[in-house]
C-alpha cells in the first residue's frame, strides 16, 4: 500500500447453484489464496453465495437462511486476514428481497449495498424476485441479520444498508471505494458516478453478466470508459462456471481498470482470478487537477476501516518509455497524428503571419530533422513549394562531417532552399570583442555559438519575410538544456511538447513511410548519430560532446518527467518505479544520480520555460507557461532534493 498502490483482485469461484455451503467453501479457499498474495481488496461475483441463477428458489426461506449462515462462515474463516472481501448474496429487508453486496473485514460486515437497477428485459427477470433500491438514505441494518444461527445477537452482521456507502481507510484516505452491481453500470446514470464524486477512488462491480457474441467487447468498453470518466479504479467481477446453463452461459469475465487503462483482464471461461495494483495516489492527483470533477453533495455515508500499511510488491506493467504506446501499430498511429498536429499548428501560424518563408537551423541531429519534416508537411498543407523553407546549416568548432553531410542530404531530398553560413569567424570576432580566450572551452565558448546561430536565423527571417522555427524538444526544456536566448528562442517551436524518446520514433516512422530513397537513408543515419549540441571541438572528426554523458540518459529523464510531472509522484515514488521499470538496465546508484540531476535542473531552469515561444501541445505533458505548467522561476527544490538525499 506504500506510495498509494493497493493490490486488488477480482475472483470467480466455481459454484453450485443453491449450495451455499459449497459456495462459501470455494469463496474462502480463493480468498485465502489471494490473502497470501498480499491482496488488500478482493471482489467476488454478484450473488456468488447462492448463485445468480436460482430463479424462484430466491423466495425460499431455506435458501435465504443458507446464505446468511454462509456469510457467517466466511466472516469467521477470513477474520484473521488483513483483506477486505466483498461477496454477493440475497437479503431480506422490510419484507422485500434485495440483491446485495456485503463488504467484510476482520470478521465483521462493514456494509451492505443493494442493487439499484434491475434488468427485466430479454433473458433477465430480476424484478420477479428482487426489489430495486430506491436510492433513499442509508440505514443501519438491525433486522433480519441481527441474530446468529442459534438466535443469539450477532453484532458482526449489523452494518449500514444502502447504495450510498463509501468505504474509506483511516490511515490512507485515498484508499476509498464504492459499489455498484452489474446492471447499475449499464444504466443511464450509474451509481458509481455520484460515488466517485463523493470521494470513492475505486469502484467495485459485482456482476453476473451472461456471455453472448460481441458482449465481452461492449462490457470491456463500459468498464474502461466509466473508469476514465470517473478518474477511478474499477474492479469488475462476473459470475462464471457453476451457474445454471439452462438458458445462459457465464464466462467469468474479470477486469481491473484504472482511469481508462486495463491493468488486468481474465480470459473468458477461465474461472480464475486477476490481480493488479491500483494507484490511488495517481487518481487523487488527477482529480485534484480536474476542475470538472466536483462534489455534488449526494446523500452518502462513509464507513471507516483500518488496514496495516505495508509495502506492496508491484506486478503491474510500468513502461520504461511512457510517452510511447505499447504496440508498434499504436505507435505508428500516434506518430502519424503527432506529425499532423505539428504541421497543422505551423500551417496556421505561417498563414496568420503571412510569412513568406519558414527559416530553420539544420544541424543533422534529431530535433532539427523533425522540425524540418514538420515544415515540409506544413508547406504541403498550404500548397506552397518546398523552396519556401529556408534551411540554414551553420558549421563551427564542433561540427562533424557526418552531421553536416546528413543535414545537406535531407535538405536536398526535400528540395528546400539551403544556405550554408560558417559562423567560425563571427564567433572568433565576438570572442575578441568581449575579451574571451578562444582556448577557454567554458560555457561562454559554447553559448556564444548558440546565440550566434540564433542571431543569423532571426536576421534571415527578417531578410526573407519569414518565421524562425524552433527545434528544441520537451526533454531539453525540462532539463533547461538550451542556451538562454540561443536555441531556446524562436518564433514558433514545433517540438516543444515532444520528448526526446518520442522524437526518435517520429523520425523513424517518417523514414519507414517515405518513398524518397535519399531522405530515408539520411534519416536512418541520423537515428544512429549520438545526441550532441556539437559546441565543443570534434576529436579526430568524431563528436566529442555527447549530451547523455553530461546530463544523463534521456530515457531516464523522460521517465522522471512523465511520472514526476504528469502524475505528481514524489521523488521517492518515481525512484521506486524507475528501479522496477529499469531493472537490469541501470543500477540503483545510476538512477539516483540522474534523478537528483533531473530535479535540480528542473527547478533551476524554470526561468527559461517562463519565456517560452509559442508551440503546439500534442500530449498530456507540456511545460508551456501559458498552459499546463505554471511555476515561479525562483521556487525552491529543497523538499524534493532532501527526499532524494534520504534515499541514499
Predicted regions and their residues:
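Enzyme catalytic cores with a strong preference for nitrogen-chemistry domains
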Residues: 1-359, 377-386, 418
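ATP/NTP-dependent adenylation/nucleotidyl-transfer catalytic domains that generate, transfer
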Residues: 173-175, 232, 244, 258, ...
